[in-house]
C-alpha cells in the first residue's frame, strides 16, 4: 500500500493536458461508484419503482446493460459493517441480483414499496431514529472481469483514468445523467499513465455508459467499506476542459 501511494503521489506531481474529446475512459472502483453506480442505484430503489419514477419500471427481464455486468447487493459478506441477517423491518435478508449479465433482474423493496409494486420485500429495508423504513443497499458487488487493469491500460493510445469527482450527484439521478469535475484523474498515453489532469469535467448518462462497455478488470477494490468493485473501461463519456 505504501509503495502504491508513493507511486500515485509521484505521478500526480506531473500535470498534463486534458486528453482529446471522445477518448476512452477508465473508472477506478471509487470513480465507478461516484460516477455511474450512485445515480444508477437510485433507479433500483423500490421507492422510485413503486411510483413509476424510475426508468426501469416494467422492464424486469430486459437486457438494458452490457452482458459483462453482474451487479448484486449481498448482505452476507463476512466482516463487512453493512452485512446483516435481518433488515430493519425484521425481514430475512438475501443476496439480490440487480443486473445479471446485462439483464435487469430485480429492484430493491421494503414491505411498503413491495406491496405497492405487487412484489415481495427483498429484505432491503433500512431506517434511522428520524425516518420510516425505506429501501436501501447493503454490500454492493460487481463481478470481476477476465483482464488485468494493467492490460486494459496498455491497450489505450490516449485516454483518462477517473478516480475521484468533485460535485458528483448534482445531475438528474433518476435519468442517469451525471456531470462533475474530476478532482483526481490521470492521463493515459501510449499505454502508460503519464500524469494528472486538472480543470477537467466529465459528463454523460450512466445507462448509456453501462450499456456498451469495453472491459471490466479482474482486480477489485473495497470502496467505502461495503462495496467490492472493479475498474471499468467505457467510451460513452464526454470529456471537456
Predicted regions mapped to residue ranges:
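N-terminal small-residue-enriched
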Residues: 1-241
Amino acid at each position: 500500500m505504501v509503495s502504491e501511494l508513493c507511486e500515485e503521489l509521484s505521478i500526480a506531481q506531473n500535470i498534463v493536458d486534458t486528453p482529446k474529446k471522445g477518448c476512452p475512459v477508465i473508472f477506478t472502483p471509487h470513480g465507478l461508484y461516484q460516477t455511474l453506480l450512485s445515480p444508477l442505484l437510485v433507479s433500483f430503489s423500490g421507492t422510485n419503482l413503486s411510483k413509476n419514477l424510475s426508468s426501469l419500471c416494467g422492464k424486469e427481464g430486459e437486457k438494458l446493460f452490457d452482458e459483462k455486468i453482474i451487479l448484486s447487493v449481498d448482505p452476507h459478506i463476512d466482516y463487512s459493517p453493512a452485512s446483516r441477517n435481518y433488515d430493519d423491518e425484521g425481514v430475512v435478508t438475501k443476496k439480490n441480483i440487480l443486473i445479471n449479465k446485462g439483464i435487469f433482474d430485480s429492484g430493491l423493496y421494503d414491505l411498503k414499496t413491495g406491496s405497492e409494486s405487487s412484489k415481495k420485500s427483498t429484505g432491503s429495508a433500512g431506517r434511522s431514529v428520524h425516518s420510516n423504513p425505506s429501501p436501501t443497499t447493503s454490500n454492493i458487488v460487481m463481478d470481476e472481469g477476465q483482464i488485468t487493469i494493467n492490460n486494459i491500460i496498455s491497450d489505450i493510445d490516449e485516454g483518462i483514468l477517473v478516480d475521484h469527482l468533485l460535485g458528483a450527484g448534482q445531475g438528474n439521478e433518476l435519468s442517469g445523467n451525471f456531470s462533475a469535475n474530476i478532482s483526481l484523474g490521470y492521463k493515459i498515453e501510449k499505454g502508460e499513465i503519464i500524469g494528472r489532469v486538472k480543470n477537467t469535467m466529465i459528463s454523460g448518462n450512466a445507462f448509456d455508459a453501462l450499456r456498451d462497455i469495453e472491459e471490466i478488470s479482474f482486480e477489485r477494490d473495497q470502496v467505502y467499506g461495503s462495496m467490492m468493485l472493479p475498474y471499468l473501461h467505457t467510451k460513452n463519456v464526454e470529456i471537456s476542459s
